[in-house]
Design a protein with these regions (language model features):
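Beta-strand-rich interaction/scaffold domains
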Residues: 100-173
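Aromatic sugar-binding interfaces of carbohydrate-active proteins
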Residues: 173-185, 191
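Flexible, small-residue-rich N-terminal segments that precede or flank a structured functional core
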Residues: 6, 16-82, 112-121, 128-134, ...
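Extracytoplasmic/secreted proteins, especially bacterial periplasmic and envelope-associated proteins
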Residues: 75, 79, 93, 155-159
């Protein structure tokens, strides 16, 4: 049985001897949300002091309080269950698809994964520590916004490959993707994504992987 009764969408590729394309969607309320850190210097924090996982949006944010010169950082997370990929399989491509309902700023948004064999849904702020990030990082330049249209990231196969190459990775495990801003000067940088809890899961984040 699939967790939450929601199977992935499978679109098998034809020809070329490859595996296939599979689209996974966030399928539970606690599987997307944000880690936030307040009153920080301009450098991106290594830890966070707030976790939110039940809102209808997940913000990726870097904002400065001009009166005090301190920053708020919020990074979004999206956890995808039941990834049907064997340990060490070659990832041909991988894309994060999200609906960004609103945003501001033009700095590049960063995409990483949680470097874990079978990441659990976040339950404490330490689950957002940057020490858990993959070494692979992909930049997404100035993502567009729209109330209902999905935006597709650049290829993040290096992020997914690093996770499935782990020695204890197994088919059926979960992958969590995170997005954050670590630059942008004093200009507010924001992308606000729809979450599983928005409008009865009408626009959950998706992870499209081809093997």
């Amino acid at each position: 049985m699939f967790k939450n009764g929601i199977p992935p969408t499978i679109n098998w590729s034809s020809g070329g001897g490859g595996g296939g394309e599979v689209t996974y969607a966030v399928s539970a309320s606690g599987d997307d949300g944000v880690f936030s850190s307040f009153n920080q210097p301009s450098s991106f924090p290594s830890g966070f002091n707030s976790l939110g996982a039940t809102a209808t949006d997940a913000k990726t944010l870097r904002e400065v309080d001009e009166d005090f010169g301190l920053f708020t950082y919020t990074k979004a997370f999206f956890r995808f269950q039941n990834i049907n990929i064997s340990q060490g399989a070659t990832i041909q491509s991988a894309y994060l698809k999200v609906v960004y309902s609103t945003g501001t700023g033009t700095a590049a948004l960063k995409i990483v994964g949680t470097d874990a064999d079978n990441v659990a849904a976040p339950s404490q702020v330490s689950d957002g520590a940057t020490s858990l990030h993959t070494s692979a990082v992909v930049s997404w330049s100035n993502p567009s916004t729209h109330s209902t249209n999905y935006q597709t990231s650049p290829d993040i196969k290096t992020v997914v490959q690093e996770i499935v190459d782990r020695g204890s990775w197994a088919s059926g495990n979960a992958i969590m993707i995170q997005t954050y801003y670590d630059s942008g000067g004093s200009t507010k940088q924001l992308r606000q994504a729809r979450t599983y809890d928005y409008s009865s899961a009408a626009y959950p984040a998706k992870l499209v992987i081809t093997t």
